[in-house]
Curated annotation (Swiss-Prot):
One GO process term, biological-process aspect: cellular response to phosphate starvation
Domain of life: Bacteria
Family under the similarity heading: Belongs to the PsiE family.
Cytoplasmic topological segments: 1-14, 76-81, 129-136
This protein's record includes keyword Cell membrane: yes
Subcellular localization: Cell inner membrane
The name this protein goes by in its record: Protein PsiE
GO CC annotations on file: plasma membrane
Gene field: psiE
Biological source species: Escherichia coli (strain K12)
Name of a matching Pfam family: PsiE
Topological domain spans for side Periplasmic: 36-54, 103-107
Keywords on record: Cell inner membrane, Cell membrane, Membrane, Transmembrane, Transmembrane helix
Induction: Positively regulated by PhoB and negatively regulated by the cyclic AMP-cAMP receptor protein (cAMP-CRP) complex.
Segments passing through the bilayer: 15-35, 55-75, 82-102, 108-128
Length: 136
């Protein structure tokens, strides 16, 4: 079996990087559309007189922040030279678990487990922002 030459490997790498960039660009545009739809939905819920609309509003706000964080992650990917910073994934994980607690808070044990997961993610975030692991 022959090994690939260096120029061929670089060409394949460039093609794959371009496909990845185009895919992330499309995903970013789709997320912007969803962010716009969520904005309209939040405006509708804000002016709804029902009591349940308050819970919908809080849940919608957290979903809004999730869209926002994913878009920020894609922007940061392009700004940092095609690299995903780990801390952005941790932010998204914390926000997603907070949303889960807001939506599904019937079982106290589940809420405790979710809270422990958030604590673990916050510790991870602290470690990622420490001087030894800080890259930016």
């Amino acid at each position: 079996m022959t090994s690939l030459s260096r120029p061929r490997v670089e060409f394949i790498s460039t093609i794959l990087q371009t496909v990845l960039n185009l895919g992330l660009l499309c995903l970013g545009l789709i997320l912007v559309v969803f962010l716009g739809k969520e904005t309209v939905h939040l405006a509708d819920v804000l002016f709804a007189p029902e009591q349940t609309s308050k819970y919908e509003l809080v849940e919608g706000l957290v979903v809004y922040f999730l869209y926002f964080e994913f878009i920020a992650l894609i922007v940061k990917y392009f700004q940092s030279g095609f690299h995903f910073p780990l801390r952005y994934f941790v932010y998204i994980g914390i926000t997603a678990i907070v949303r889960l607690i807001i939506v599904d808070h019937k079982s106290p044990l589940d809420v405790l487990i979710y809270s422990a997961a958030i604590l673990l993610l916050v510790i991870t975030l602290w470690l990622c922002n420490s001087k030894r692991l800080k890259r930016e």
